[in-house]
């Protein structure tokens, strides 16, 4: 099975290198062929791994030792269990769909090969993060995901808004990563190892240990370590108050919005807390902190979604709210439920983002939902996909979101940690808020009067915001007086 693990992790990297360094030589078709092939191989290897794990086999081993410093070993290794196998399948499947979608979405872009190289590199970084068996490799995967997201958010680097957005994402995540690095430093200093298994084995003996952050005051080592690690998750998974970078990340092309928000960067923090669950279970204070932050994010980001008029920003704030739900589940010690919602959310949120991209193309790059209406008649396939995604998002019975959200609400109801009462109120209220902003967007876009006839122009259609998911090259944005919305190409 080691071959399958290596293929799953490194096949996207091979595609990224070929498309990045030899993109001009192999051309557009060559670039998307090698990257899609790489991610496809990774998906097949991930499915084989998942089947093997379901058969009861797990793996925890070292591939390569970088260095040995005293008793501390710095290694590259894989830990493959149920959590890892699930994340591998989610990441590779959504990434493959985004790669295929990109063929149509970016067909006229000058940076076509560069974009395919970036999204494959993004997939590789996330695979190394989820498959790691030690804190050092986790940190490198963590930072690699952040670096590539910086490159992707600022993909159209000639636009000042894109440069501002990627710098904002980079700097806000540095705040979270500082806490994350402190947490790893505490693990190294007090646990004496970077290996997950050894750290979890030592943890019970350190449950009562205290440290002095401020002279004369004792703080629980486990609480401080867990909160520092969670601050890292607050940055990556865009939890309040470190959520501010994520709406601006809409400056990147729509395919990467789907990849960042559905399967990769923003789920890294949720995955990390679930992986560190043996440590978090030793501190009720840390769990109370997690559940409170998650509850605030779940409710108030939903409120912000109600007042957005940019179609991608509505879906972005929806992502923030749903990440809050996952964090609440983590705080309630329902780790499997959090990962379940992560998995279902990855699929329906990617669907919603890709449908939003289809709407943007059909509307000639107008993103303001106030200028839409009645698109169901012109974009029937996009309409039905948006409806399916919206029904799953609000938790309609028999759709995937219903089962995962229901599980979260039930877990919070019986949680005993501090802040559980507020969290229960927040997730219950959030159900109604989610339904409101989801169907506000759905009805404004696909039903009602055809308002683009009233707009009758391109640039003014963007009044009130400057989120244009297209190049800053001066071509026509929005529908002209003689234009009509149209369905996207089949590949999209």
Which stretches of residues belong to each language-model region?
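...captures the hydrophobic TM-helix bundle architecture rather than a specific catalytic motif
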Residues: 1-492
